[in-house]
Amino acid sequence: MVKSNKPRKIHLNANPTPEALAELSIGDIVYLDGTVYTAREGIYKRVLEDGIAMPLDLPAKSAANFHCSPAATQHDDGSFDLGAVTATASFRFSKWIGPWLAASGAKLIIGKGGMSSQDYRDHFVPHGAIYLTTVGYGTGALLGRGVKQVRDLHWKEELGLAQAMWVLDVENFGPFIVESDLEGNSLFERENARIAAS
């Protein structure tokens, strides 16, 4: 819902309540606490097209899907160091986003550059989900500071590190900008229209 032109700083749980989501306005600055997971085309194809069961109990464990390929180093003991968690462009996943929201119960999609307002209206609004965008380029290391630990890693052998599902415990993870709200409004489209009209 569009409530104000002034952005606010919001701390949001990665399993947000409907009430918490309803309070968000496009342009708000969001920091996440809780557990987020990465999923992109490899995961989407495996679950939605190949019919393989999800490796994580969603949305109970997390309702926040990050479009990301972590820059990770794996140690001999199996633990990881994440140097950066850099978002990837979400528009590439448009064909899967509706079915994924339905299957996963995700309420937060996090990525780079947003998606179309048509995607927001057709897929996000019916599922009570919003889109959070990263802030510019080169923020992967900044976001990495908010990752407290790698809780789990699923389908590494099948998909490789970039496409595997990373399950990350995060704290003060951000900043992200609310790009879409529960009504399907798009911050980027609103600002582009204002620029075009000026």
Predicted regions and their residues:
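Short secondary-structure boundary/capping segments within folded domains
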Residues: 20-24, 55-58
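Acidic, glycine-rich flexible loop/linker segments
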Residues: 7-11, 150-198
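Short alpha-helix capping/helix-loop boundary micro-motifs
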Residues: 13-19
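Short hydrophobic-aromatic micro-motifs
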Residues: 30-32, 66, 178
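Short, basic/aromatic beta-hairpin or loop at an interaction surface
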Residues: 1-11, 103
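Short, well-ordered loop/turn sites that connect or cap secondary structure elements
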Residues: 24-25, 30
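Feature captures the catalytic cores and cofactor-binding loops of soluble hydro-lyases/lyases
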Residues: 38-173
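Short, charged beta-turn/beta-strand-edge "cap" motif at the junction between a beta-strand
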Residues: 18, 29, 35-39
